[in-house]
UniProtKB/Swiss-Prot annotation:
Stored HAMAP family: CobT
NCBIfam families, per database record: cobT_DBIPRT, PRK00105.1
Signal sequence, renumbered to the chain: none
Family: Belongs to the CobT family.
Functional description taken from the UniProt entry: Catalyzes the synthesis of alpha-ribazole-5'-phosphate from nicotinate mononucleotide (NAMN) and 5,6-dimethylbenzimidazole (DMB).
Pathway: Nucleoside biosynthesis; alpha-ribazole biosynthesis; alpha-ribazole from 5,6-dimethylbenzimidazole: step 1/2
Listed name of the protein: Nicotinate-nucleotide--dimethylbenzimidazole phosphoribosyltransferase
Lineage: superkingdom: Bacteria
Reactions catalysed, as given in the entry: 5,6-dimethylbenzimidazole + nicotinate beta-D-ribonucleotide = alpha-ribazole 5'-phosphate + nicotinate + H(+)
Principal EC category: transferase
GO BP term, example: cobalamin biosynthetic process
Pfam families xrefs: DBI_PRT
Length: 350
């Protein structure tokens, strides 16, 4: 079992505030439904945040990084050293998510949840049980104790962020090989073949995708994790940064903080989180559908519809960051528009 808190129930949606938001939307100076999904987004946030005025102003971004032993099987187009180099790039402000965080006014924290780095890095929070996972094609990626540590690292990151009273949280990831790990987790959770899930990741070609799928399918058989418990799956084929995000999602939901879900890898972490603690599901707000072919299946399993689809496949939390202005617009429109009565506008056609 994982730490006891992982299974604690999350708060329920405030029906009072959700229903009040529905009433307000019907009173705003626009035809019913004219703002499309932005209306429902504002209503959902009002219920999740238990407020009459949903907010998306304070949105910290937390990036979890980890390395993957499965890279030894030639599943990635880039060398493992890129993980550490990109962590330094995050910290120095040169990565895509660094630029987006500045543009959005979001605090960016980077957590080394399990990279191969042997040194403390300036601007990086180190919170890891080991240096990278084991190669899951030959042995289990993690022990239960290591998995539990990663969940606790995610909870600690959320506790730090919660001190600033955030309206939402965005989680991102970095780790060469983590699309393979995520595909293995998703295929195991969904009980489907890796061929249906595995995508190009950092840019492998068709032959590379086929090889990745074969490696994953063989590992699922080796460990006997097809449709197994999420705990068993995460130990067998998981990743430290992915496990940390699982823990962070549950910890955020338990604090009534909605999470704007990023792309394929974070969505897989979200699916595992929901399987572990179904009460966190309402707090997941999908941002985008990525170019990774398995993302659509994972979103369907989560029963959510993304806000945008721009063929992104960068990760880092970038898709969620790009979608955040839409969430802010939904809140601003809900809170700031005049009602028919305030504007002295007839509320129905003549």
């Amino acid at each position: 079992m994982l730490p006891e808190w992982v299974y604690h129930k999350c708060p329920e949606i405030s029906a009072v505030h959700r229903d009040a938001a529905i009433v307000r939307q019907a009173q705003l100076t626009k035809p019913t439904g004219a703002l499309g999904r932005l209306e429902q987004l504002a209503i959902e946030l009002a219920g999740l945040q238990a407020t009459e005025q949903p907010r998306a102003a304070r949105v910290p971004i937390i990036i979890f990084a980890g390395d993957h032993g499965i890279v030894a099987q030639g599943v990635s187009a880039y060398p493992q050293a890129v993980t550490i180099a990109m962590m330094a790039n995050f910290a120095s402000g040169g990565a895509a998510i660094s630029v987006l965080a500045r543009e959005l006014g979001s605090h960016l924290e980077v957590v080394d949840a399990g990279t191969l780095s042997q040194d403390e890095m300036i601007g990086i929070v180190t919170d890891r049980p080991r240096h990278g996972t084991r190669d899951f094609s030959v042995e289990a990626a993690l022990t239960l104790a290591e998995l539990a540590f990663a969940f606790e690292a995610g909870e600690r990151a959320v506790a730090r962020a919660a001190a600033s009273q955030p309206d939402l949280l965005i989680f991102g990831e970095m780790g060469i090989g983590n699309t393979t790990t995520s595909a293995a987790i998703a295929a195991s959770l969904l009980g489907v073949s890796a061929e249906e899930i595995a995508g190009s990741g950092t840019g492998v070609d068709a032959a590379g995708r086929a090889h990745k799928a074969r490696v994953i399918d063989a590992a699922i058989v080796r460990h006997g994790v097809a449709a197994a418990s999420p705990e068993k799956i995460l130990c067998a084929v998981g990743g430290l940064e992915i496990a940390a995000i699982c823990g962070a999602i549950i910890a955020a939901a338990q604090r009534r903080i909605p999470v704007l879900i990023d792309g394929f890898i974070v969505s897989v972490a979200a699916l595992a989180a929901v399987r572990l603690n179904p009460s966190c599901q309402p707090f997941l707000l999908p941002s985008h559908q990525s170019a990774e072919q398995g993302h659509r299946l994972v979103l369907r399993a989560l029963n959510v519809q993304p806000l945008i689809s721009l063929d992104l496949r960068l990760g880092e939390g970038s898709g969620a960051a790009i979608a955040l202005p839409l969430v802010r617009s939904a809140c601003a429109l809900h809170n700031g528009m005049a009602t028919f009565a305030q504007a002295n506008v007839p509320d129905r056609p003549a």
